[in-house]
C-alpha cells in the first residue's frame, strides 16, 4: 500500500504476475503497472472474449480484467475466477478522423457510401455497439449496419482501421480517442442510446501468485489504479 517505506517493493520484485486485460486498458494498465511495487507485471492485451476463452481452455494468468462485467461474472460462475470487482467505467463513442468531415453527426452513419468499422459480436465493444443499434428505428439501424465494412476482434482493430483511413467512422471507447492524441475526434452517441460500460476484474482461481494478484486488484480500485485509469481517459469505478 501507500504507507510502505520506499523500496519495500524491491524484496518482492522477483515475483512476476501476469495480467490478461482488455485491449482498451493498455494505456491505463501500463501506467498503473509502473506504480505497482508488490511484483513485476507482464501484461497481455486482447479482446476480453479472447482472454476468457483462453482461461476456459486452461491458461492461468494471475488477473483477468475485462471491458464488461458479464464475462468475469460468467467465469466466476464457472469456478474459474474469484469474486469479480467493478473497477472502471467508459463511454462508447463514434470516432472519426480529426481531419475528415465525412461523418459529422450520429445520423450521418447511415448515409450512402459511409464506411464503418465495429467490434465483432463477441467482444464487449461489439456487444455495446449492437445495444446502441438495437435501440434505433429499424430503417436507421439497417442503413448503419449496411455501412459496416469491417468487424474487428478488439477495439484496437477498430482504432487501427480509423487511423489508417480505411473507414470513415468506428464505434470505440472515449479512452481510445484520448489515446490517439489529435488523430481522432469524438461524435457523441445520443444519451437515450448510450449503453452503460463497466469494467470488471478478478483474481484467477489457481493463479500462480494469488497474494500479489489480490494486491494488484486492491490497488486498481484504490488511489493509484483510479489515477492511472483517469489519466488514460476512463471513468472511475461505479
Explain the meaning of each model-derived region.
Residues 2-34, 49, 53-56, 66-69, ...:
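Exported/periplasmic ABC-transporter solute-binding proteins
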